[in-house]
Amino acid sequence: MAFWNLGTLKLEQFRPGIMSKAQIGGNLIMVCMQIDQGKEDTGHEHPFDQCGIVLEGNIEMFVDQERRILNANECYFIPAGQRHGWKTF
């Protein structure tokens, strides 16, 4: 799928409290996620780049040793192979 409309995009349950839709290409993953407060991913990595935008709320993310709280309208980029994770509050 080349184009997404976030207003009509159908999300599926990824884990309890996390709804998502992912599109994986050869070198990049694009993901739309709705994450309940109090959820956490303690860290993982994958063989493709990932980037995203926080649309609302806030999330604490780490990429390798860098940690930051992101708010609405802030973006992130995760290079392939970098350990990363997040938590919502």
What are these regions (language model features)?
Residues 1-27:
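A short, N-terminal "cap"/entry segment at the start of jelly-roll beta-barrel domains
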Residues 16, 31-46:
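Conserved short histidine dyad/triad with adjacent acidic residue
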Residues 34-36, 46-61:
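Short, conserved beta-strand element in jelly-roll/cupin
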Residues 42, 51, 66-68:
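Short, surface-exposed secondary-structure edge patches
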Residues 58-60, 67, 83:
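Structural motif
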Residues 66-80:
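Short acidic-glycine-tyrosine-enriched beta hairpin
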Residues 80-89:
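Ligand-binding loop in jelly-roll beta-barrel domains
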